[in-house]
Amino acid sequence: MARRILLTIEYDGTAYSGWQRQYNGLAVQQLIEEALTRATGEAITITGASRTDAGVHALGQCAHFDTSSRIPPEKYPFVLNTMLPRDIRVQAGHEVPDGFHARFMTCGKRYTYRILNSRHGSAIRRNTFAHIPVPLDVDAMRQALPTLLGTHDFAAYQASGGTAKTTIRTIRMTEMTVQGDEIILLVEGDAFLYNMVRIIAGTLIEIGLHRRSADAFTEAFRTLDRLSLGVTAPPHGLELTKVYYPEEAFRMPEAVRWHEE
């Protein structure tokens, strides 16, 4: 009998064309599917919670797949990590109900954007931080953040190519911390448009450089015009940190759950 398994996956996106399997480039999804096929002897297709772009990283990507293999769910990290490159790690495996869907059942996501605000950059952090060599006005950046909170039409915060049916989104939390020369932005919401977090980060950088006023986000909500906001920040500063699901999504039928009790 087929079971549905949910994996939690961490990856450094530097070497990859993104999460989603593509014809031109090596994707994270492809490598995990190939490892699963070897492990189970089945042709496996996985569905991810977020289709991260080339160069974007993940600490908490989630993906589900169906299998008739009797490999215990908690053993998948051990099995798959022996086959995967070191920049992709499976951190957890769980059995979920047949109706669970990693992408369509999400109720929120948290993203982290990292900025290195130093003159000369960093050899060690070059792939995980966006480097800004000019001093940023962090106070001005923080002043702009609360405007994003709540439910708004984020049409101006979507890059061309976005296919969302609605641009109404709810941002539940924003936070900016400074640790030495590192500026860390956290954004959490119910869902995000294409390149939305990178556009927010790019606008904050321009606010920090005094190229845009701190009310740029307010203006964008008024005009719904992409030109009201800053450039899209580089992909390598972005990380998908956590994916949230409603508690009921994990409730297993008694016949399946009994062996866990």
PLM regions and their residue ranges:
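Structured-RNA-binding interfaces characteristic of tRNA pseudouridine synthases
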Residues: 1-261
